[in-house]
Amino acid sequence: MFEIFKTVLMLSCIGAGMTMLLLLLKPLTVRKFPAKWQYAIWFVVVVCMVIPLWKFIPQRDMQMMAPQEAVGQIAQSDNQENAAEIETVIIEQTPMEYREIPITASRSLRIYDLVAYLWFGGMGVFLLLAFGSYFLFLMRKKHGSIELTEYEIFEEVKKELHIRRHIRLRVSKAAASPMLVGTFFPVVYVPSNQLDKETERMIFRHELTHYKHGDLVFKWLALLVNAVHWFNPFAYLLSANVSEACEVSCDMAVIKNLSEQEQKFYMNTILDLVEQEKRRK
């Protein structure tokens, strides 16, 4: 267990360093790089905090060593084995009362194992709370909601974005703002208040663009980073910046093919929805 925790600590240090560097460079990257590239950069950090990439680098073995180096290592190994045998004989011939039993290393090992199990338990609690709150959230949204089938504007936007998969559309009183949920069985929830057709079209473009980009998968991966590195404050900063970059990237993708007037209308629609959500909280 402690070996796994050591790997996690290394990943955590790498991720913290990369996050700190990106936050320091953020004023520059926001001006120089488009939104999708900023999003991709944060994705790289997330991957580096989950996958120990150095384990995939091939290590040199005895076949790749020079003959002198290989002979040297073999001789050193033989010397270590002989020394171990001599030490064993000395220990066996030493009276019991004069033997020194090394217990410090054993105690340290127990402490390290305890820390590793504490980390594992914290990760379990984090995931339990995260999944529990998520399922309660879904139940609240689904309770009392109504599914809209073959909704014309929704289907039109799906065709515009070349989305063929069936995505359900539901109206919910518990939805403070439009949202896409469900990685395997996607559903778009919209508030129950009446909206004009153009506003609905902009909302559907936003949520379906999230689906097309696979943003839900990325957010689940960011949640996994939070769970594994729950002790690292930079993991929470990373998660917040991932969410921000995700929304900005989605907005830029939506307005890319819109006229200037439509872009203004879209941004005003998003700002109005954000204000409505804040008031409901």
PLM feature spans:
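Low-complexity, acidic polar-rich segments
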Residues: 73-108
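Membrane-embedded and juxtamembrane structural elements of multi-pass membrane proteins
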Residues: 2-71, 100-281
